[in-house]
Swiss-Prot record:
It holds the Pfam family DUF179. PANTHER family: UNCHARACTERIZED PROTEIN YQGE (PTHR30327), UPF0301 PROTEIN YQGE (PTHR30327:SF1). InterPro entries: AlgH-like. GO terms for cellular component: cytosol. This is UPF0301 protein BDI_1431. It comes from Parabacteroides distasonis (strain ATCC 8503 / DSM 20701 / CIP 104284 / JCM 5825 / NCTC 11152). It comes from the Bacteria. Belongs to the UPF0301 (AlgH) family.
Length: 198
């Protein structure tokens, strides 16, 4: 009889993580924060890594924390990761001309910046749906930790980012990201979350 490991053998690529990469959780990862998650790396150096889970929306909204936004359409908050879970972060495509002091992640994404400038932008009536994404907490790895997890096959790395990163949510986005890895990975989307329950 085929062993469990052979039945659910996972193929991984050899793509190395860099700033702006996305990490796609392998299908059996059981961690509450990272199960079927897609993580955007906003920093990756020899000293450690930082990123945000893109597809885990919470029941919280930004409007509840800032009375100025009480009458605005609801602005969702996502679960960025287990580190600093009470701190609010944001990524955006507005650029550092609109949001000073924003850190450039790649050609079209930025991290944080002057929050007062962002508030003014919203209060002036500019829509932010699909342009700004808020998180509570972030995902962090110490020196060498992420590379170890990748070698252990917890993550597949991709430099392909979709144009809906700022509005992505749910397991459907994980499946879409897996399919962008190529045909070798399509079986990932067919696996049960827990193979022992299949």
């Amino acid at each position: 009889m085929a062993s469990y490991k052979n039945i659910f053998k996972i193929t991984h690529n050899d793509v190395l993580p860099i700033q702006g990469s996305i990490l796609i959780a392998e299908p059996f990862l059981q961690d509450a924060y990272f199960q079927r998650s897609v993580v955007l790396l906003i920093e990756h150096t020899e000293h450690g890594s930082m990123g945000f889970v893109l597809n885990k929306k919470t029941d919280l909204i930004v409007n509840s924390f800032f009375k100025e936004f009480a009458e605005f359409p609801e602005i969702p908050i996502y679960l960025g990761g287990p580190v600093s879970p009470n701190r609010l972060f944001f990524i955006h495509s507005l650029g550092d001309n609109i949001i000073p002091d924003a850190l450039k992640i790649n050609d079209y994404l930025y991290f944080d910046g002057d929050f007062n400038a962002l508030k003014r932008y919203i209060l002036n009536g500019h829509p932010i749906d699909g342009k700004v994404k808020f998180f509570l907490g972030y995902s962090g790895w110490t020196e060498g930790q992420l590379n170890h997890e990748i070698k252990r096959n917890s993550w597949a790395v991709s430099h392909i980012t979709t144009d809906n990163i700022l509005s992505a949510d749910g397991e459907g986005y994980w499946k879409d990201s897996v399919e962008l890895l190529g045909n070798d990975y399509k079986t990932w989307t067919k696996y049960p979350k827990d193979p022992y329950l299949n």
